[in-house]
């Protein structure tokens, strides 16, 4: 199997599409984002928020998972929604009684720390964030770019839906190296697709040891509760993702 680059500098330097000047520019952008992400950690801490960054392909079920948390649990949370256009996902959550603020990125395929900082100020005008336990950031649907931008989250959770197939982990290794946990979503569709859960587990193990994996269906309350319990445990532990973006 082709060697997988685990280090950011190594990935940049080995990219045939980037020359020396381009690598320098990208490195500066990412370094600036890293500094802002560190500032965000202090802001989250001051607000008493435990932050979870949800990443996946478009349509993998990030918004549906958040709706399920609202339906099946008593978690006190608010949401920052990332999409290129429209506020449809934010409206879906608001209909469930969840305070949500939509970030529309235009042509940008990911959220950046500076976007979160300004959106957080807007969200604070919508709800009393000190009454919240958690902030969920629903990143732009994309298995590539969000993996390069630290948002200061305590947990980075990646969703992989059954219809996407079981081969994505090693095809998009940078994303799954970010993962503090992986949710295999739309688990109720397992019987309709040739999806090998053991392959996903094996591929994950090649990238990162002991990544918790959850099978989740929005139709199965207990599957959602297991993820809720995992997130709550990490919050109690004060866990902060050690992944270096």
Question: Which positions does each model-derived feature cover?
Answer:
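Long, basic/Gly/Ser/Thr-rich N-terminal segments
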Residues: 1-12
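Nucleotide-state-sensitive switch-loop elements of NTP-binding domains
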Residues: 16-55, 60, 69-154, 165-167, ...
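Walker A/P-loop
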Residues: 63
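Cofactor-binding loop segments of dinucleotide-utilizing enzymes, especially the Rossmann-like FAD-
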Residues: 82, 161-162, 218
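Conserved C-terminal guanine-recognition region of P-loop GTPase G domains, centered on the G4
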Residues: 146-153, 162-211
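Canonical P-loop GTPase G-domain recognition
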Residues: 189-245
């Amino acid at each position: 199997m082709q060697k997988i680059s685990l280090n950011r500098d190594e990935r940049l330097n080995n990219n045939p599409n980037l020359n020396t000047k381009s690598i320098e520019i990208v490195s500066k952008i990412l370094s600036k984002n890293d500094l802002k992400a560190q500032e965000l950690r202090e802001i989250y801490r001051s607000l008493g928020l435990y932050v979870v960054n949800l990443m996946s392909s478009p349509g993998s079920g990030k918004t549906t998972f958040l709706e399920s948390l609202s339906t099946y649990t008593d978690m006190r949370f608010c949401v920052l929604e990332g999409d290129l256009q429209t506020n449809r996902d934010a409206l879906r959550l608001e209909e469930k009684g969840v305070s949500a603020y939509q970030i529309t990125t235009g042509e940008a395929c990911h959220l950046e720390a500076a976007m979160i900082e300004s959106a957080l100020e807007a969200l604070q005008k919508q709800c009393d964030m000190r009454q919240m336990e958690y902030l969920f950031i629903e990143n732009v649907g994309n298995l590539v770019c969000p993996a390069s931008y630290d948002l200061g989250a305590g947990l980075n959770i990646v969703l992989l839906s059954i219809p996407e197939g079981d081969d994505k982990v090693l095809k998009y290794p940078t994303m799954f190296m970010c993962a503090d946990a992986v949710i295999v979503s739309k688990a109720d569709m397992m019987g309709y697709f040739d999806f090998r859960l053991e392959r996903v587990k094996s591929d994950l193990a090649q990238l990162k040891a002991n990544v918790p994996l959850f099978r989740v269906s929005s139709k199965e309350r207990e599957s959602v509760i297991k993820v809720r319990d995992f997130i709550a445990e990490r919050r109690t532990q004060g866990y902060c993702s050690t992944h270096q973006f």
